[in-house]
Amino acid sequence: MELLALCWHPLWVPCTLVLSVVLWARRAAWRPAACPVDLRGKTAVVTGANSGIGKCAALELARRNARTILACRSRERGAAAVEEIRRATGNPDVHLRILDTSSMASVRNFARQFLEEEGRLHILVNNAGTTDAMKASAPSRIVNVSSFRHQTGEANVQFLSGKEYPKNVSKAYDSTKLMNVLFTVELARRLQGTGQRTALPSRGVTVNALSPGIVHTEIMKNYSWWVRLLFHLVGILFLKSPTQGSFSTTYCAVSEEVEGISGKYFDSDCRLALPSPLARDPAIGRKLWEASEKLVGLDDGGREPASRKVA
């Protein structure tokens, strides 16, 4: 009874209202509408762009007149997203390419097809394997969608090879997001100097990681109905919509404020933030990178060995 009385204390109502207003005001410190950047003549690739944050980010890039390529696993859902974005933006230069990131054969096929058909890439959201095209198109940006949950992740190289496994699905997610940040920092180090062929050395290929915040996306469909209902009720006040969740992605992809910045982590309010100590450890980053190269069959320069290439 004492607990029930405490929960129904009259101060809970105003405190909850104040907290809700504060959280609502902090949903994003930056709005896409405040950034007038036009991407005409630029090519952008967004993976997982048939729904959620990816689709919202692709829509914003297309709205800015970029040639926007949606890299999706499902042809049907990807085609529907392409048509929706074309109608919403009036930009006919929106296209679908099939990419299943769980299949290295699909990733390699996507990369080869892109290099043959496009050749130039200026914005890459959460993708890999087309770095050469980005170097030739500098200044270019790579945007990796991580999460604030990287703070509790584990940087265990054995997770990559399957020799060991995280304790549960939640820990696996957190560890994956930690590796996103580690790879971002390591890739930024390896891309240093890519701007030397341009007028400004700082305008080469940059790469940054970000957190979209807590977003109500289609990932919730995998949970039971009561969990979905709870998230829906809580989400009215506390969760971001996919559009709001895409703000930090769009910010890192197009904002002039991010020009020349690389190897950094941005929070869901589009502000530079300090990632976890593990995420800032260069030795761990190099170890994870080297282990990943071996697993996907790349050489030390990040290229596929000639013996593996298909004519």
Feature locations, PLM:
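C-terminal helical subdomain
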Residues: 107, 176, 209, 232-275, ...
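Rossmann-fold NAD(P)H-dependent dehydrogenase/reductase core
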Residues: 2-10, 24-227, 296-309
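Short, positively charged
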Residues: 17, 22, 53, 236-238
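Alpha-helical packing segments of well-folded alpha/beta enzyme cores
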Residues: 81, 110, 183, 245-249, ...
